[in-house]
Amino acid sequence: MKFSCRAATLALAGVACVASSALAHHAVQAVFDVNKPITVSGSITKVEWINPHSYISLDAKGEKGQVQHWTFELAGPGALRSAGLSREDRGGLKPGDQVKVEGIAAKDGTTTGFLNKLYFPDGRVFVLANKDPYAR
């Protein structure tokens, strides 16, 4: 079987495209502004324990008293389970719980963020990300 230089080049180009897409997908700084830390307190409206990333949505009061709907991205269920939060009870979180979230804001200016630290109603603190966002 003859393997041409053209076929090898095309195969390598394909692998490079897939690899770069995977890296971009998993780079927090591709979507979130690591230089824009945020803290949001509010009432949980939804917990999505799904792959490849889980999400917590909450309603918080804006600067002018208006309700803002926030969504925070977390790691996937496997990583959350390893960190001590289970899918079965959604990490002990349920709609109506008052929580505080520390994270980084989305680059596009929407009310979305990447969760670094979650303060539970019972006083527990869950740390998802290292303080150095490039360490992920």
Segments and roles (model prediction):
Residues M1-A11:
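Bacterial N-terminal signal peptides that target proteins for export
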Residues T9-S21:
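Bacterial N-terminal signal peptides
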Residues L23-I38:
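Short boundary/loop segments of OB/S1/cold-shock single-stranded nucleic-acid-binding domains
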Residues V40-I44, Q98:
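Conserved hydrophobic positions within beta-strands
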Residues I50-K61, Q68:
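Short aromatic-glycine-enriched beta-strand elements
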Residues V67-L80:
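Short, basic/aromatic beta-hairpin or loop at an interaction surface
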Residues S82-V101:
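Short nucleic-acid-contacting surface segments enriched for D/E, G, S/T with interspersed K/R
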Residues I104-N130:
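OB-fold/S1-family single-stranded nucleic acid-binding modules
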